[in-house]
């Protein structure tokens, strides 16, 4: 299935690229998410006519992500969770908990932007967490998990 990308897609291509993808990936993810359109002649002509508009939109999204990165750099948040005396958590701290803690601290973050390479945190301690804000914009934030008093 041939598609025209309407924005940069990680590991696939940039704005305006003509890409071949499996039909399910295109039909069920890229097209419904507004990341691509089928590569018909009419869509190609329409894309070329609106190319400047799409590029301006992509620049605005990238600039917004860069602004959010500047606010998040060096930021840290403390999350209190139930824990045993040995420091093991009863449960875990995952991306949703981290996103909610940053949002409560005035730094809006979506759970899908929080990348935990080794899974949820199950012990108290200090962790560095990767935040993926855009295809080209990533930063690291600090999360401190402490035992509830």
Curated annotation (Swiss-Prot):
Signal peptide: none annotated. GO terms for cellular component: ribonucleoprotein complex; ribosome. Gene3D superfamilies: Ribosomal protein L9, C-terminal domain, Ribosomal protein L9, N-terminal domain. Pfam families: Ribosomal_L9_C, Ribosomal_L9_N. One of its GO terms (biological process) is translation. One of its GO terms (molecular function) is structural constituent of ribosome. SUPFAM superfamilies: L9 N-domain-like, Ribosomal protein L9 C-domain. PROSITE patterns: RIBOSOMAL_L9. InterPro entries: Ribosomal_bL9 (IPR000244), Ribosomal_bL9/RNase_H1_N (IPR009027), Ribosomal_bL9_bac/chp (IPR020594), Ribosomal_bL9_C (IPR020069), Ribosomal_bL9_C_sf (IPR036791), Ribosomal_bL9_N (IPR020070), Ribosomal_bL9_N_sf (IPR036935). Keywords: Ribonucleoprotein, Ribosomal protein, RNA-binding, rRNA-binding. The keyword Lipid biosynthesis does not apply. NCBIfam families: L9. Binds to the 23S rRNA. Belongs to the bacterial ribosomal protein bL9 family. This is Large ribosomal subunit protein bL9.
């Amino acid at each position: 299935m041939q598609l025209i990308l309407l924005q940069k897609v990680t590991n696939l291509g940039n704005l305006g690229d003509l890409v071949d993808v499996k039909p399910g990936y295109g039909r069920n993810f890229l097209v419904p998410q507004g990341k691509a359109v089928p590569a018909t002649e009419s869509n190609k002509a329409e894309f070329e006519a609106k190319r400047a508009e799409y590029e301006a939109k992509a620049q605005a999204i990238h600039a917004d992500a860069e602004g959010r990165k500047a606010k998040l750099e060096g930021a840290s948040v403390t999350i209190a969770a139930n824990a045993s005396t040995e420091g093991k958590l009863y449960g875990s701290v995952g991306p949703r908990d981290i996103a909610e803690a940053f949002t409560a601290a005035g730094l809006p973050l979506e759970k899908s932007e929080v990348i935990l390479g080794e899974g949820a945190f199950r012990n108290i301690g200090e962790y560095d967490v990767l935040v993926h804000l855009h295809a080209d914009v990533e930063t690291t934030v600090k999360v401190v998990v402490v035992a509830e008093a």
